[in-house]
Amino acid sequence: LFSSRKISETDDIINPATGKTGGTIFNNAPCFGSNWGIGYAKRIKTFFEKTGFDIWENDGPFPGDQCASTSHPGHHGLEDSQWVQFNMQKELYHWLNARGVYINSPDWYFLDGANKTGLGYREVNFSLPRENQRILNRQNIFDALWEQNPAMGWGFVPLTAYQGGGKDAVLEPLHEHIEDYKQLMMQYYGAGIQACYRGPRLYDTEETKQTVIDVIQWYKKYRGILNADLIHLRRADGRDWDGFLHVNAQESGIKGLAMLFNPLKTPITRTIEIPLYYTGITKQAKITFGDKTVKTVTLDRFFKSKLTVTIPAESYVWFTVE
């Protein structure tokens, strides 16, 4: 953890508006150009040199903090503080990249060498009831993957209370909310996104454990296509179906995988237009629902096909395209 905490009056960011510490983007934060900040970069390097670790999960620094200090050894004053801190971070990321360290960063630092960042979310949303969280989760996935591919993102699964909301907002005890738990896993892994669990355990009964195993085995089986680029079919709004389609024309077997969701309390049947141009398929496609039902569809001149699908209440279906 770098940001969102106080180190000392001499090492923290000096707020240009007040001349005091505090009041940064996330209240308190150290300055990378302070003695502590310079030492932080050195300690990170020493740690990876000595341990051989190859993953760095870091929270901060966040972009934009300017420091009005004139006594920090790393920068002259306010005017160069932001620039210097960006470059110090960039140098550290490049150093880690050169050693093959995988970087999960707190912001959009991909051009500096980061490998993954959060999808974007509001912490207060994790206080909402589980059924609302499922919809918001799909909205976050849908919106984030306009700008990044699935492997670039991660998202929360709050197993225990985050900020509030009571029993309706949490997944614990997991065995009592196993369907919600499974669907949140399937939404993330089905989008090819890493799920980050906020809680003390991944399962609490043998049934819950088997559910986790089943989902992870499913992900591993289809990992190739699940990490492929994603086509947005319909954004979740809680009023009708929503979904997305992974596509990769270079895959030798499965060239597409779609997930369709039904937020309503009754089953729905919809005829959905599936765009298959980026699968590389030109004439006919084999659609397989959940490893079972197989259907052959013909593509039109725009490489699309209409598919009639029934989606269970408050649930989902998935199918592969070959």
Predicted regions and their residues:
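C-terminal beta-strand-rich structural cap/linker in extracellular carbohydrate-active enzymes
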Residues: T298-E322
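Active-site beta-loop-alpha junctions enriched in small/polar residues
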Residues: S3-R5, P61-P63, W108-F110
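Short beta-strand segments at enzyme active-site cores
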Residues: L1, W56-N58, I103-P106
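Glycine-rich tight-turn/loop motif centered on a GG-T
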Residues: H72-W83
